Amino acid sequence: MNSKFILKYFILAFFLVSCQTYQIAYDRFSQVLDSQYDIGVNYSRDGIFKSVISIKYDKLKNKREYFILVRVESRNSSQIKPEKIITDTRFEAKGELVSEDSKRVVYYNDFYDSYFPYDYTTVITEKNIKVEIYKFIISESEFIRFVALGNDNIAAFRIYAFRNDVIVSFNKIPFKKFLDDFNSKVKLLGGS
């Protein structure tokens, strides 16, 4: 009976750890604790938005940096440049382009034969997809107000892009677990 209980507990613990939506890593060379909390994916008329909240702690400077990263995939990047975000606490942050890349995606029909990949009749569409990552810096006081547990457990922000507005929301309760985990790792490094 005792071994079954331990096995069930081990499986449950493994499942909970594997389902985490965040990552925290420490780089010993630069002495920076970096974290990312995955909020999820939102779709608009012209593209796909993937949002991540990131907190960095620099041990040498004893300083934290809070920001939201937005990854945008679109077929026409001139139509979908995130200009700013506004949180539900009315904080506004301007976007800064961090990285851009493009990739070619080819969709094939059901009769596609991998032995003859150059058969032009099997291609349905080809798309050149632009991938851009934007960074929105948030001050520490505004960030704490934004994620503080209050009357409701949902935090939200709106991404304003050219002809595309997307509302992104997330639950504050699992986010608080991520924040507590990050703060405990900062304390282990001797920070406050």
From Swiss-Prot:
It comes from Borreliella burgdorferi (strain ATCC 35210 / DSM 4680 / CIP 102532 / B31). This is Uncharacterized lipoprotein BBD10. Residues 1-18 form the signal peptide. A lipid is attached at residue 19 (N-palmitoyl cysteine). It comes from the Bacteria. GO terms for cellular component: plasma membrane. Coiled coil: none annotated. Its main location: membrane. It is a lipid-anchor. Keywords: Cell membrane, Lipoprotein, Membrane, Palmitate, Plasmid, Signal. It is found in: Cell membrane.
